[in-house]
């Protein structure tokens, strides 16, 4: 099945984000935009996880279902050198445990936690929990991975699961970087409000066996 997925959003708990970014607003607007699967964003924030759990029904295998669309747990972490990383998380129990494990001075305040960990250290931490990880908006000159590193392997030391392009780049641009030739590209809007001109401005069409964490994980390996 072909799934329309927006995998990078934020909640009402992130700085400079609309108070309207709650599940019961995001879900109907996602349906209006034609999205089947949406990242929750901010999945390391305990209060946001409570709202996700209260506003959805857990279908199993990482999917939290609302009548208008399905959700999967995602978060953005600002790590060493102010580089942003997107993390996709298997379920709420893992998210709560990872939140406790992550070294961050603001993880209970801001939906986008800051951490002193390097990209490689963050990679190793999230892989302990079978999460997926990749650089957020990789070419953005302020918080993108390539603003600091000449190579993605200098950042992570190992191959991450994907490269997010975001609004600052496209596939044609990223294809000029030889080391990215065997990477999966994702493109997401990094939405800070649920309105149709923000949510799903860019999204991914992913061939999946079904809507589940396992199917997404398999799809991103191809």
Question: What function would you assign to each model-found segment?
Answer:
Residues 119-122:
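Phosphate-interacting basic helix/loop segments used at nucleotide- and nucleic-acid interfaces
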Residues 112-116:
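Active-site glycine- and acidic-residue-rich loops that bind
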């Amino acid at each position: 099945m072909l799934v329309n997925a927006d995998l990078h959003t934020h909640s009402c708990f992130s700085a400079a984000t609309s108070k309207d970014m709650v599940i019961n607003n995001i879900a109907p607007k996602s349906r209006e935009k034609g999205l089947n699967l949406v990242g929750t964003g901010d999945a390391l924030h305990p209060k946001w996880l409570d709202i996700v759990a209260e506003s959805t029904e857990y279908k199993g295998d990482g999917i939290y279902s609302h009548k208008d669309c399905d959700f999967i747990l995602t978060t953005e972490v600002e790590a060493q050198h102010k580089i942003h990383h997107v993390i996709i998380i298997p379920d709420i129990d893992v998210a709560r445990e990872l939140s406790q494990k992550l070294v961050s001075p603001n993880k209970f305040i801001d939906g986008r936690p800051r951490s002193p960990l390097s990209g490689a250290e963050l990679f190793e931490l999230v892989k302990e929990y079978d999460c997926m990880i990749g650089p957020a908006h990789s070419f953005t000159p302020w918080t993108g991975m390539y603003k600091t590193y000449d190579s993605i392997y200098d950042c992570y030391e190992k191959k991450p699961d994907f490269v997010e392009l975001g609004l600052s780049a496209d596939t044609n641009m990223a294809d000029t970087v030889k080391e990215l030739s065997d990477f999966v590209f994702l493109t997401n809007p990094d939405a800070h409000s649920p309105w149709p001109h923000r949510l799903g401005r860019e999204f991914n069409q992913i061939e999946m066996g079904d809507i589940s964490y396992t199917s997404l994980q398999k799809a991103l390996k191809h």
